[in-house]
């Protein structure tokens, strides 16, 4: 699946351009685990790739300086490194999200560039699944569970809105359900 980095519409792997706005569709991040590991070796140890999307890939890593704390490393696709608009969007995502302090919003630890210049965001690693995955796996969710999920999403969005931050990409893929009482 290829995702338009502007409007987030998804297309089959053989599509090259977004039908809505004509944006070229990037493939999954071309950053390999070994390349990423060598570029961040002093700071992080890459454990595994968690997933990929239109703007890049996310890896489970351990932050070496802090006792191998697990983190999710979001890495911008190399295909977008020469596009100032995407570099700015990636940076804005990190700085905006880092301003939000709320239990229903992932915590950003830092953002930066690997030794080869690949931008990354290190954030809280959450165990669980996206709402999209839960819906595909379980089908329709009970009304009470939906109400609780929506309540938590609304509280997180409210915290963002109080800071003047608008999400702009709220969808089941971007709602993460953690395990247990988290």
Region locations from a protein language model:
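Conserved ATP-binding/catalytic core of the eukaryotic-like protein kinase fold
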Residues: 2-23, 28-182
